[in-house]
Amino acid sequence: MPLHKSAEKRLRQAARRNERNRARKKELKGVLKNMQKLIDANAAKSEVEAAYKAAVQKLDRLGVKRYIHPNKASRKKAQLTKALNNYTPTAS
């Protein structure tokens, strides 16, 4: 337990920030999983493109605001772009 008032405040702030960071990263994981799920399910190209757009927007936002490292955001965007460009839905 903190002994000083300022240390107590820092503890509260850290807890709030930790919760916020976890929520943002969880949102990102959901968006990325959604795109991967659409690719695995052999969805229409337009659906995958919409998921790609949402994922790139989320990555850009989190990279700029430093929730994730900007280079990680850039790397993930490149991976998603490559997956989208190589994606061709097969008739099943």
From Swiss-Prot:
Coiled-coil annotated residue ranges, if any: none
GO CC annotations on file: cytosol; small ribosomal subunit
Biased amino acid composition, Polar residues: 82-92
GO molecular function, one term: structural constituent of ribosome
SUPFAM superfamilies: Ribosomal protein S20
Pfam families attached to this UniProt entry: Ribosomal_S20p
Keywords for the protein's UniProt record, in alphabetical order: Ribonucleoprotein, Ribosomal protein, RNA-binding, rRNA-binding
GO biological process per UniProt: translation
InterPro entries noted in UniProt: Ribosomal_bS20 (IPR002583), Ribosomal_bS20_sf (IPR036510)
Location of the region described as Disordered in the Swiss-Prot/TrEMBL record: 1-26, 73-92
Gene3D superfamilies named in the record: Ribosomal protein S20 (1.20.58.110)
Database matches in NCBIfam families: S20
Family, similarity comment: Belongs to the bacterial ribosomal protein bS20 family.
Role according to the record: Binds directly to 16S ribosomal RNA.
Entry protein name: Small ribosomal subunit protein bS20
Species lineage: Bacteria, Pseudomonadati, Chlorobiota, Chlorobiia, Chlorobiales
Gene name for this UniProt entry: rpsT
